[in-house]
UniProtKB/Swiss-Prot annotation:
Origin species: Mus musculus
Gene: Fam185a
Cysteine-cysteine disulfides: none
The protein's name in its UniProt record: Protein FAM185A
Pfam families: DUF4097 (PF13349)
InterPro entries: Toastrack_DUF4097
Phylogenetic classification of the source organism: Eukaryota, Metazoa, Chordata, Craniata, Vertebrata
Length: 378
């Protein structure tokens, strides 16, 4: 069963991003200031930062960051900076201290229109806060447990690579969005728009509130992959051993999990789901072609009573709800398996179909109302 996603902050691992990187203790108000625009007030940065920079930039440039600590990127205040031609950087530390501050490079290359924030030695417990033009492209590398949060940015390209740190994307729009992590979680809050690639290794989990775009490709290894809403033209979601739990999905969707279970609360479009050992549980709200296969698990198919479809269900056992109004139902037993075919609501065999195959498990089919599919608590 797909549960409601908890608030973003509660899903961040302990020791990872805290309070959107803004809750760390900062230094005194006499912080050192550097940069090409010393007369700028630096409004919007953390108060009492250990060090601050304000640089004048092109509003359509690129931010490149390589850090072992926490990083937060958000857009400039459009009222304070209507031209969008500044980058503001602030460093906060724990208990007024951040080791390795002198190793931090903050520079802008006007020819390449690239803003660089680089360090391999800054205190991993520090946090770097960046206010950038809203259209800035992003290329971020985080090492160790350094986490990344990007919010309210609209860009052509957003690339984030982390090791053990959490990646949070909140209300991001990008033509090309790529997130890769070796051991950190990935959390998408609000609506994330674009062509999206997310790859999470080891036990990393991917939690999504809403994705909207043309093409989405998401994979995990041992971790849970869950999404509340997917509105895409085509999506490919896979996991080696983790479960895949989806809420409302629209478009052409392919789901694969070798060891985990697959759950879809509501499918509108073409759906292909397969698992080797896991179970598959799907509610088909509006039919495209549906193909469900599990080698060793069972399959549960649910649909509203109004759905027009031709179905073919094959398994060691097949159970069709007595309340389902099925016409021309036929049963064929061969060996250890059984196949049941039928039509719903005067559909024809040439219309869109549901095909479910579970050679070692049970295939069940039942009517369920849209309200029941919401799985609201009693």
């Amino acid at each position: 069963m797909f549960g409601r996603l908890p608030p973003c902050a509660s899903r961040v691992r302990a020791g990872a991003l805290v309070g959107a990187l803004g809750a760390r203790t900062c230094g005194s108000s006499g912080a050192q200031r550097q940069g090409s625009a010393p007369d700028d007030s630096g409004a919007g940065l953390a108060r009492g930062a250990l060090r601050e920079w304000t640089l004048q930039v092109s509003p359509f440039g690129r931010l490149r960051a390589r850090l072992p600590c926490h990083l937060a990127v958000r857009p400039l205040d459009p009222l304070a900076h209507p031209d969008g031609d500044r980058v503001q950087v602030a460093v906060c530390g724990v208990e007024h201290v951040a080791r390795g501050l002198d190793s931090l490079q903050v520079k802008y290359d006007a020819d390449r229109q690239e803003m660089a924030i680089l360090s391999d030695d800054i205190d991993p417990q520090a946090s770097v806060e960046v206010n950038a033009p809203v259209k800035f492209d992003l290329s971020i590398e985080s090492s160790g447990s350094g986490s990344v949060k990007v919010q309210n940015i609209e860009c052509d390209s957003c690339k984030i690579d982390t090791e053990q740190g959490t990646s949070i994307l909140q209300s991001v729009k990008s033509q090309k969005l790529h997130v890769q992590t070796k051991g950190g979680d990935v959390i998408c809050c609000g609506t994330v728009y674009g062509n999206i690639d997310i790859h999470a290794s080891d036990k990393s989990t991917v939690s999504i509130e809403k994705l909207q775009g043309s093409c989405v490709n998401i994979s995990t290894e041992d971790g849970l992959l869950q999404a509340k809403y997917l509105y895409t033209e085509s999506s490919f979601l896979s996991s080696a051993a983790g479960n895949i739990a989806l809420g409302n999905v629209h478009g052409n969707i392919i789901l694969q999990s070798k060891m985990g279970n697959i759950t879809v609360d509501s499918s509108c479009g073409c759906l292909k789901a397969s698992s080797h050992q896991g179970a598959i549980d799907v509610y088909v709200s509006q039919l495209g072609e549906v193909a469900l296969t599990t080698e060793e698990g069972s399959i549960a198919v649910k649909a509203p009573s109004s759905l027009r479809a031709y179905f073919k269900l094959s398994g060691k056992e097949v159970v069709v709800d007595e309340e389902a109004h099925v016409q021309e139902m036929a049963k064929d037993c061969k060996g250890d398996g059984v196949t049941v075919t039928g039509l719903m609501n005067q559909a024809s065999k040439h219309e869109r179909w549901i095909n479910a195959i579970a050679p070692k498990g049970t295939v069940s089919f039942q009517h369920q109302s849209w309200f029941q599919s919401l799985k609201l608590p009693d």
